[in-house]
Regions:
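Short loop/turn motifs at secondary-structure junctions and domain boundaries
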Residues: 37, 58, 63-66
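Structural motif
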Residues: 72, 79-81, 88, 104, ...
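Short acidic-glycine-tyrosine-enriched beta hairpin
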Residues: 86-102
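A short, N-terminal "cap"/entry segment at the start of jelly-roll beta-barrel domains
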Residues: 1-50, 55, 129-144
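Short, conserved beta-strand element in jelly-roll/cupin
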Residues: 45-49, 64-82
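Short beta-strand His + acidic residue motifs that chelate non-heme Fe in jelly-roll/DSBH
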Residues: 56, 82-83, 99, 105-111
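Double-stranded beta-helix
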Residues: 108-144
Length: 144
């Protein structure tokens, strides 16, 4: 009988196609966190073109625009190499890579490019950066 009970509220579920999410950096990234209403961690979707070398070598140390944040990269399609201190790690669908906040990292897309989800969070309570809100100006890429 309980299964047939009518629900008076909508489920707390958000569904959005990646292509319908607000683009930043000329479409290289999509504001997935804000579009889905996530409040517990940072999350963007990146689509990098083949063999592109413009993804910044960066970290999320205490003086970064997203400080003290470790990141997990989840490839959706394509391949890339994540470079950290001269070591190379393959990003491909079916793998996930975690990178600590102080670790410099750069992602170099393979011959077909790559689309991946980047999830970030810090040990303390998460506070979304103002730049991640819909319509906000993204930060300048870090200088190398």
């Amino acid at each position: 009988k309980d299964l047939l009970r009518r629900r008076d509220t909508m489920p707390d579920v958000t569904v959005k196609a990646i292509e319908d999410m607000e683009p930043i950096y000329g479409g290289l990234a999509r504001r997935a966190r804000a579009e889905l209403g996530v409040s517990a961690w940072g999350m963007q979707v990146f689509t990098l073109p083949p063999e592109w070398d413009g993804y910044p070598n960066h970290n999320h140390s205490s003086d970064a625009f997203d400080p003290n944040q470790e990141e997990v990269y989840i490839p959706l399609s394509g391949t890339a190499t994540l470079v950290a201190d001269g070591s190379e790690f393959e990003l491909r669908p079916g793998t996930m890579i975690r990178v600590g906040p102080d670790q410099l990292r750069q992602i170099l897309p393979g011959p077909e490019g790559i689309r991946f989800v980047a999830i970030g969070g810090a040990p303390e309570a998460f506070t979304p950066g103002a730049w991640t809100e819909l319509g906000a100006d993204p930060p300048s890429p870090p200088a190398e």
